[in-house]
Amino acid sequence: MEKSLIILKPDAVQRGLIGPILTRLEARGLKFIGIKLSQVSSELAHKHYGVHEGKPFFAGLVSYITSGPVLVVAVEGKDVIEIVRSTVGATNPVKAAPGTIRGDFGVNIGRNLIHASDSPENGDHEVALFFSSEELIRSERSVDQWITE
């Protein structure tokens, strides 16, 4: 099963969008295996966004993600990366399709509400950065048989 890390960034938390965003993700049939409110440290932000180090926007990105509480969510399922990313929408909310999280709630690329893993490999890596194995809970849901074949 694929895993994806989803981060509801400080702007989503401050704007009171946790409920509407989680509702959309859950309605897609995603199985939450970990969820917590967290304050991202500078060290963790550097590890998470390390691939962008040296780019002009890196310092601002670290400053933004550490500026307030975030909601960190781990999800698991078949094709979860593709499902989450299509639900989230394009990185730039101006270009995100209506009906996506960023298309409906986003304002600009600098405050784009949400992070989602972009590959199964990154999903595994990112979930491990933010959650210990003890924090991940896997269980069967009665609805699973109606969601996947």
Curated annotation (Swiss-Prot):
Coiled coil: none
SMART domains the UniProt entry points to: NDK
GO annotation, cellular component aspect: cytoplasm
Domain of life: Bacteria
Catalytic-site annotation from UniProt: 115 (pros-phosphohistidine intermediate)
Location, primary (coarse class): cytoplasm
UniProt keyword terms in alphabetical order: ATP-binding, Cytoplasm, Kinase, Magnesium, Metal-binding, Nucleotide metabolism, Nucleotide-binding, Phosphoprotein, Transferase
GO molecular function, one term: metal ion binding
Residues that, per the record, bind ATP: 9, 57, 85, 91, 102, 112
Stored Gene3D superfamilies: Nucleoside diphosphate kinase-like domain
InterPro entries tied to this protein: NDK-like_dom, NDK-like_dom_sf, Nucleoside_diP_kinase, Nucleoside_diP_kinase_AS
Pfam families, A to Z: NDK
Localization, UniProt: Cytoplasm
Catalytic activity: a 2'-deoxyribonucleoside 5'-diphosphate + ATP = a 2'-deoxyribonucleoside 5'-triphosphate + ADP; a ribonucleoside 5'-diphosphate + ATP = a ribonucleoside 5'-triphosphate + ADP
EC numbers, comma separated: 2.7.4.6
Top-level EC class: transferase
SUPFAM superfamilies per the UniProt record, alphabetical: Nucleoside diphosphate kinase, NDK
Family according to the record: Belongs to the NDK family.
Oligomeric and partner information: Homotetramer.
NCBIfam families in UniProt: PRK00668.1
Protein name: Nucleoside diphosphate kinase
